[in-house]
UniProtKB/Swiss-Prot annotation:
This is Methionine import ATP-binding protein MetN 1. Keywords: Amino-acid transport, ATP-binding, Cell membrane, Membrane, Nucleotide-binding, Translocase, Transport. It comes from Staphylococcus epidermidis (strain ATCC 12228 / FDA PCI 1200). The complex is composed of two ATP-binding proteins (MetN), two transmembrane proteins (MetI) and a solute-binding protein (MetQ). Pfam families: ABC_tran (PF00005), NIL (PF09383). ATP binds at G38, F39, S40, G41, A42, G43, K44, S45.
Amino acid sequence: MIKLNQIVKRYHTKDKDVLAVDHVDLNIESGSIFGVIGFSGAGKSTLIRMFNNLESPTSGEIIIDGDNISQLSKSQLRKKRQKVSMIFQHFNLLWSRNVLKNVTFPLEIAGVPSGLAKQKALELIELVGLKGRESAYPSELSGGQKQRVGIARALANDPDVLLCDEATSALDPQTTDEILDLLLKVREQQNLTIVLITHEMHVIRRMCDEVAVMENGKVIEQGAVSKVFENPQHEVTKRFVKDDLNDDFEDSLEYLEPLDHDAYIVRLNFTGENTTEPIISYMTKTHNIDVNILEADIKNTKNGSLGFLVIHIPHISEEHFKQFKHNLHEQHVNVEVLKHG
């Protein structure tokens, strides 16, 4: 279990004080994958660097498996960092060392005998799919291969927690998916708790059990990924979800012909089993209404499917629409009115 209690981080500059992280509270279950998303400058990278005390909080507590990180001695912190490992956006490999020696490096620091360190490193290199590349140097590797080395190195001391700071941001889409699949694989095999930082909502959708959304140093929304996608509350969250679902219909609303007074354009958001239910058939039969489909999409998450449907109902009374909306809510379908005549 990871607990963050009222975490604050201030930077003092010559001209002003900067509040990078503003009273953040988080509870992260052991064995889960927890995502933190936000735009540049939201404070997410500063936050994750406090998990292993690369940055010290100005105030507040970070407790990992019962240990208050800020209260550990230097020797205790070194040992704790072996169990709270990290991978980075730009890999942070040692360019003068080949793949094998990059992976053995943390084992050398931990005092592991060279024979055992080499054996462990070779196992990890095979695990991340780089068998045969042990003698290659970082300059000879692709971005995805470099990140695989970073993952192998991070796993060298059998960590309990893996921190991922924008680990796929420098990669192309296909390589990103390969790295995400690898992280899911190692998490399953080694029962890791993964905390990842990203500005890409599809990474959250594919990987995470829960997500926290940050803006201006604060957590503005938090919850299970499926719930946040189904019913985002904050405007920043809505923007992330909209971009990931390729839902740009609202931008086109102003170009539509004026609606009749009893017409509606609505978005239906649904998750899980609802994505395969015959919603349109249900609406037309149960409510005896005509429906035009304007836009639709379905995405897969780690724990199921989610999607949206934008429809035009050309004629429906206000009272009938209230009943229609209520019935869909009973089926766990969220209804959002985009335009009314």
